[in-house]
Structures are given as structure tokens and as C-alpha cells.
Amino acid sequence: MIQPQTHLNVADNSGARELMCIRIIGASNRRYAHIGDIIVAVIKEAVPNMPLERSELVRAVIVRTRKELKRDNGMIIRYDDNAAVVIDQEGNPKGTRIFGAIPRELRPLNFTKIVSLAPEVL
């Protein structure tokens, strides 16, 4: 469950290291975002000499949350951290590599590029 002011790790090599959620895209009064939701975030920590800089506004899709994810078959998945992947306006990742496991729930949400770059899909 990600809400405004939540800090997230970045799971790609776009140049950002840490994000802070400031808005959840898709509904005017939604309080929480879950895996697969798009957020507007500000970069809190960035790698030097990269295209993305600190205090820049970006869009990101949430790929891991510490809150449990319940599947239809009864399986429950929980990750160790809250993480997101920085995306552009079309939904493609800005980085060329994805770090860590990615849930398969992203595939039907048209984030197939992120799923194909991921080293592990749970």
C-alpha cells in the first residue's frame, strides 16, 4: 500500500535511486496504490551524471510492495521493499535494466516491456 509521502526504491538503471510518491494516477480520491498502479513521484536521491536529477517529477509504476498480494489461486506474495520503475508517458521504462523480482500481474496491464526485462517473474 503506497500513499503520498511514501519513499520507494527504484528497480531500474534510469539514474534515480529513491522516489517519494506525491500522487496516485487514475482516481481523484484513492488513498492507496498497489502493484501495477502508476504514480507521480519526485526523485529524492539520484546517481550523479545521469539524465534524471534530484527533485525532478517522474511517473513510475509500482512493481513491489511490502503489503501482501493475494492471488486468485490462494497464493500470497510479499516483498522485502517498496519499489517502482520509472516510465515515460507511453508506459515504457526509462532504464534499460530491471533489478529484482517482478510479479506477473504486470503483464495484463500492458507493462510487457518491464516484464521482458526482468530477471525473475513471480
UniProtKB/Swiss-Prot annotation:
Pfam families assigned: Ribosomal_L14
PROSITE patterns with a match to the protein in the record: RIBOSOMAL_L14
Keywords assigned by UniProt, alphabetized: Plastid, Ribonucleoprotein, Ribosomal protein, RNA-binding, rRNA-binding
GO MF annotation, one: large ribosomal subunit rRNA binding
InterPro entries per record: Ribosomal_uL14 (IPR000218), Ribosomal_uL14_bac-type (IPR005745), Ribosomal_uL14_CS (IPR019972), Ribosomal_uL14_sf (IPR036853)
Top-level lineage group: Eukaryota
Compartment(s) where it occurs, according to its Swiss-Prot or TrEMBL record: Plastid
BP terms from Gene Ontology: translation
Role according to the record: Binds to 23S rRNA.
Subunit structure: Part of the 50S ribosomal subunit.
Entries under NCBIfam families matching the protein: rplN_bact
Family matches, as PANTHER family: 50S/60S RIBOSOMAL PROTEIN L14/L23 (PTHR11761), LARGE RIBOSOMAL SUBUNIT PROTEIN UL14M (PTHR11761:SF3)
Protein name: Large ribosomal subunit protein uL14c
Organism lineage: Eukaryota, Viridiplantae, Streptophyta, Embryophyta, Tracheophyta
